[in-house]
């Protein structure tokens, strides 16, 4: 990608010749491009085809299989045949391309026929425009994905596939579902363009490899079973799960069997001893031995050393959820969950991680008494907290040694000494390896967990055993802030307000025991769990949490996350102060996955059930009277988040909006969860909820009523947000449109899904017409009888208030 964008000649209708040669800077095409890729449709397809074919041919002729990146370093790849090759990041096009363009311009000017000269000038300018677009700073990852999907020319596709190397990893990762879905369901030219990048990244990142393998399996599941076995997606998944893509400098030889394998340690000893930190191959080795011993006919597929522990860890978490679903009562499910996780702790620490986290780490412990089974009628989703130790590099850092639970007290005593009482040598010793005593024990054996009989730990009344779905956040480091000087009177006033309006605790409810734990502040939860952990004294200790779901297809949730993330980025770019909270989704298969819990939040259902107050009275109870700083801040947060989610619900047609699926956090924001019914799907396909979004009279009361300034501010935000979103409609629509390819998801039922989505952006309306539309949607949603009926239906059938 060049340092400066070259401005081409102004775009003219195809029937008119360009006013000058390609280098003319009298006008700029870039202003047109900013309105979306769709504006470029005026370029002659034949000209575009020729230009891109020339680009591809020049790449082949000038560079062959050798390439360098923007910094002059070669990029090592594996091509479609698994053979090492290299590819160039075409940030700066070869000089020969520019020289030929100049020659083309010279040829045009030397022609004798005026009509031929004008036609050649026009074609040359259009070719230059397309190439300059690809080279310009405006050519971002969203535009690249759009051209990769819409273009039918191999030259364009190959060029875009090569340009993927020029974007930041984080930017490409956002579109990973789209890239893999195109690889599975589109033609070979698209797949050939995408594969080198995927293979290259899999060599660099173990977490990227895992996510690719999981998504390839999930998005291939809609194919017929006979087709699926031989599909490109299945073949690429097998390649990723093999050691072929493991970086050469990190490949480890399979360790020899430990003497412990031959000494026949008793199960009790093996249960409480750890393996050598790097001998994780014992997991895959023992698994293979167990499979072949029990069924000699089963083909022995070599699992990759680096992915086997993580895959078994995930499988065991999913198996726990499936077994919990067979139990009749929530109390039995909770006791069984605690028992299962207690056994799982005997296999930790290990070379496993939580894929939803944003930093490298090793899982060392699961505080099992803090786990909770979440509310669900037919299934058993559950939430766990996970203690991890952050590390610089997951692959090269040794797995920490296990610290027995009985060392917690002494560890805490040491921690209370000055400077934590731990020398540098002692800290380093915490990560030392221990002998491998459990090579012959399958590290994540689900069957063994099911067979063992374990005494259930006593349920402590003061422990936060239960917590509602989406009710915690991940621990983050506090940012350093400059000192702020406040008058003593302000300090006294704020302290008195804080003491007078401390958040209230919920009472224990046998039908919803999670409500009590919900009110515990996250930092307090972290402190309490850390004090009870044998690893809590370590400086790199962190607490994470994750929701494990079995029996639910999270592919629609992932699609909704992407749309919310894109809208969030658009509103930030356009400086519209709307607030939404996208939470991470990990799709494990077509019927299982993991969800990142949200910041301290309770559902509106729990608020109303526990407090027996209206939403406004609850705000007053939690944040103080109308004129306090805390209330005004919470009210503004409520308005900004309500407007943001109303637009999300309208654009995506989100259904099933009962009060159990709307959370309220400690700062006053509302957060919508559970996007299982979007676009063309609705609960039981009844299409019962007909309003554009959910806006109840209680919501309006919190805003200050229909005549209040905050209600007018809410409608203004709605208008500004819709105007900003439609400026970038293509970025939102392409996320959905690409995922429709080859999909059997309910949200894509019907042929008009994408057309209806585009219509909801109202591209043909003026801003005055949009303002009238917003007024009509707000008024219709407040008066919607179907919203009231659906809330009543949920109360009668599920007890949701």
From Swiss-Prot:
Segments of this protein annotated with the region G-loop:
526-532
- Name the record gives this protein: Phosphatidylinositol 4-kinase beta
Q: Which organism is it from?
A: Sorex araneus (Eurasian common shrew)
Looking at the record, which segments are called Catalytic loop? 653-661
Q: Where is the composition biased (Polar residues)?
A: 259-268
Enzyme class, top EC level, equals: transferase
Report membrane topology: Peripheral membrane protein
Keywords of the record, alphabetical order, are: Acetylation, ATP-binding, Endoplasmic reticulum, Golgi apparatus, Kinase, Lipid metabolism, Membrane, Mitochondrion, Mitochondrion outer membrane, Nucleotide-binding, Phosphoprotein, Transferase
What cofactor does this chain's UniProt record say it requires? Mg(2+); Mn(2+)
